[in-house]
């Protein structure tokens, strides 16, 4: 089983090579690193080239944005599973791919190889570098989970069949990965397998969290959920958010008490 770790970069400075070196440290797993660079001029790509590692393949081509860059990266990937790791983000430890392979192999042994009619997503939780805590995700993907909190993009391994019918839609500037995830699990019959251990160290603080992007993200979320959830599901999700005090929970999950809050979330998920 081979993994393609796809990284899209543009003048990323030292973050690119830091991410690459972290990926290269993975143990007991077959993988390649596909770097799709948008014609950087800061020398960041040259530092990676200097590593002279055969597991790294670099493609330099202009793109229209990060999701277009990811689509280009997919076209150069030869792995059985794709993982998208942004510059500055890292795997949680050096055995993430080993655990992903074990989880995927367990599914394949029980259910068979992923196909275009039944692709496979393997996912886990993320460690937030900003909050200094693990943000746990639900072990079951339901319409409510799709509405409120899907797995972090960097914490997902997609079987290549997930992209056989269609790629990311770059017209969604902030939530193209969210749209593709909902399409995958709610419309394209994609199976999901949960890995309990954290997958990535998410840096945060990038474009998607800027005030402009947050506003656009909300608009895209509204449009996307209307496409994939029924009116009843949307009503249920909105009522759930109100009854469970979502604004308060959001504040707790990212504030000084984030470690305590996320630990409680982990215990709740384990009991389900």
PLM regions and their residue ranges:
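Conserved nucleotide-sugar donor-binding catalytic segment
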Residues: 134-220
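Short beta-strand/loop segment that forms part of the nucleotide-sugar
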Residues: 30-39, 59-62
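A conserved acidic beta->alpha catalytic loop
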Residues: 37-46, 86
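Short, acidic, metal-binding catalytic loop of nucleotide-sugar glycosyltransferases
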Residues: 21-30
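Cell-envelope/extracellular polymer assembly enzymes that use nucleotide-activated donors
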Residues: 2-4, 32, 179
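Conserved donor NDP-sugar-binding/catalytic core segment of glycosyltransferases
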Residues: 90, 94-135
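Glycine-rich, basic loop-to-helix element that forms the pyrophosphate-binding segment
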Residues: 61-77
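Short aromatic/hydrophobic "clamp" motif used to bind/position activated sugar donors
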Residues: 82
